[in-house]
Amino acid sequence: MAPKTLYEKIFDSHLVHEEADGTCLIYIDRHLVHEVTSPQAFEGLRNANRKVRRTDCTLATVDHNIPTASRKSYRDTKSFVEQVDSRTQCMTLEENVKAFGLTFFGLSDNRQGIVHIIGPEQGFTLPGATIVCGDSHTSTHGAFGALAFGIGTSEVEHVLATQTLLQKRAKNMLIQVDGELSQGVTSKDIILHIIGLIGTAGGTGHVIEYAGSTIRSLSMEARMSICNMSIEAGARAGLIAPDEITYEYIKGRPLAPKQGEAWDQALAYWKTLPSDEGAQYDTVIKIDAKDIPPTVTWGTSPQDVVAITGTVPDPKNASNEAEAKAWTRALEYMGLEAGTPMEKIKIDKVFIGSCTNARIEDLRAAARVLHGRKVADGLYCMLVPGSGLVKKQAEAEGLDKIFQAAGFDWREAGCSMCLGMNPDQLAPGERCASTSNRNFEGRQGAGGRTHLMSPAMAAACAVTGYLTDVRKVVGHSSAKVGSDAAKPAFEIEVSDAKSYLVDATPAPAPTNVAAAGAGALTDEDALRDVPASHISSSGGGMEKFTTLTGIAAPLERSNVDTDLIIPKQFLKTIKRTGLGSALFWPLRYDAKTGEPDPAFVLNQKPYDQSKILVVTGPNFGCGSSREHAAWSLLDFGIRAVIAESFGDIFRNNLTKNGQLPVVLSRAQIQRLTQDAKAGKQITVDLVDQLVITADGKEKFSFETPEFTRHCLINGLDDIALTLQRDAQIGAFERNRSTHTPWLDGFGYHANSNSSSLLDSAKPLVNNVTATDW
């Protein structure tokens, strides 16, 4: 047998069926659900009268748009969440987990938190598992040697209904980091350095495996930070082979295999997962750890990185014209001048949190810097723990007192200012030192300016009020800021995170899902008086795509992220429709007046009637998993997008909505752009897989996977197609229960495709049972 990579072992072991064109149906072991990308998926289940196949393998929480203000007076979601649209999503999730019988960590539960923090925390994340969530940073879980990736809402529905996904095999990329890290360099610096090296499209079509002595020396929390940002490098997922550090982290957690025979069986399997000697990788990148400096972003893409000791780059030094234009645009947005030393850049806010850096080790690192120091005058700083249990542990260790004494706002768990879907946002023009994962335009608030960095560096910035080399605040730098001579020693009594965990219990029994009926209103719809005609339909197929002829709008831009396609404020919907007016909001509308900008192409005739979008740059649709981006294009009328390359999740989201992503060469796109700029119609023929110029003289061929092509041409519902393979899925599940029984949830009966539920749940903390509504 040929040697295999870690990725290949996991993928092959989860294969249920493979089509002739290489489209694979793989089984999903773990599904994390949150309030933003799930409403339409549950609605689709209702409309098709489908249930959740594996409630025992599904875990739900609220995190993206919840307030992080104090919950001391919390009574219920309806009274606590003030923003109407956020409240609607949160209450809709509460309604759905009740109806479908899912384990749910709500706002009064200490276990609530960011999905990618609570999964590992509870032992829900395990080596060798396939893990998905309607969030692009699901790659975080790859730190455990799991194949974890983000999916769109249509795929969320697919997993809920079938516990499987349709996937194509990815390429293998190995990034090997060896040597000892320099002082002040952390895992966040490692991943920012990697993204700066390969670019935000460098990993497109790949799964990255991180290896080398540097990676092996890292803690699990540090490894999670690296895998978390694999999506920022364009990769489908990021993986680190499990080892003794992994096993020790997992052992004893509520949803991990229990000590004894179950643990020994799982451990023996996990030890077979690392890549075989001689396994082949499509791309190999080697990095010397000593070449990685404390790193910070300067622009509006995660690839816009520089050493904290460096300067803002000059577009004159860009490698090509497109890059020079991108740098110029980024400098204008960020309000920076080329050549400015990074440490001369003044900041307005500091945010320590997010699924990248809101774990207990991150908080300890920041507290070590802040201990005995004060936040600079005029600066607002906030610390948002990644979960209620992280918050509880930090308070037990006295970290909250250190942050508050320094002048930080100590918050409750949630995604917070990472994407600003809740009230935690930057005002226009405000500059933030942030431990989050994306610095896109408007990511933390319209007009906000984000610099990504490690928790320790963010804490150092809080002390000085400027972007700051952390080594000047703590460490051995000769240019040290302040003095440690009069400061008391930083001493905390480090506690064991596992001591804050509680026993897990089975998922609750579902209520009467069928009573909702196809197209019926949920209780939340009735509460908001939403007309039945406004509830979107799903699960019933899509419009056929054969040949499309129409106006093509030219978009001359590279690395168009999903935040730019549709900003976060429009994600607070429980519908799939009505988003066309939000498409390219930051580009289509004047930021001050809100009026349409006549300079933007879609506001001009005939492009306001465009059916096709021609993008001149690569990596269109990079960033988050929000299917709202595809929905907004469709609602506007655009059914085909032509570009050099696409973000992997976005490309999938298009096809799930009857839209076609077309990959052509740069030269071919330049030719089509000529027709587009002239307002001429072009043709996209999926049947013959051709794009035809306006005069009909030039035809450019493209490739679409045959199964995807078949579904698009015939307007097929791929969930219904997958359910035709129910017998194969059931056989896979029975085999899974035999060979990897630790992946089955409590009380699962292999021949029933449903959880067997206990009559009563075991009491947990704060009188909270298995699920908190």
Swiss-Prot record:
Its EC number is 4.2.1.33. Belongs to the aconitase/IPM isomerase family. This is 3-isopropylmalate dehydratase. GO terms for molecular function: 3-isopropylmalate dehydratase activity; 4 iron, 4 sulfur cluster binding; metal ion binding. Binds 1 [4Fe-4S] cluster per subunit. It is an enzyme of class 4 (lyase). Monomer. [4Fe-4S] cluster binds at C355, C415, C418. Keywords: 4Fe-4S, Amino-acid biosynthesis, Branched-chain amino acid biosynthesis, Iron, Iron-sulfur, Leucine biosynthesis, Lyase, Metal-binding. Pfam families: Aconitase, Aconitase_C. One of its GO terms (biological process) is L-leucine biosynthetic process. One of its GO terms (cellular component) is 3-isopropylmalate dehydratase complex. Pathway: Amino-acid biosynthesis; L-leucine biosynthesis; L-leucine from 3-methyl-2-oxobutanoate: step 2/4. Catalyzes the isomerization between 2-isopropylmalate and 3-isopropylmalate, via the formation of 2-isopropylmaleate. Its cofactor is [4Fe-4S] cluster. It comes from Mycosarcoma maydis. Transmembrane segments: none annotated. InterPro entries: 3-IsopropMal_deHydase_lsu, 3-IsopropMal_deHydase_ssu, 3-IsopropMal_deHydtase_ssu/lsu, Acnase/IPM_dHydase_lsu_aba_1/3, Acoase/IPM_deHydtase_lsu_aba, Aconitase/3IPM_dehydase_swvl, Aconitase_4Fe-4S_BS, Aconitase_4Fe-4S_dom.
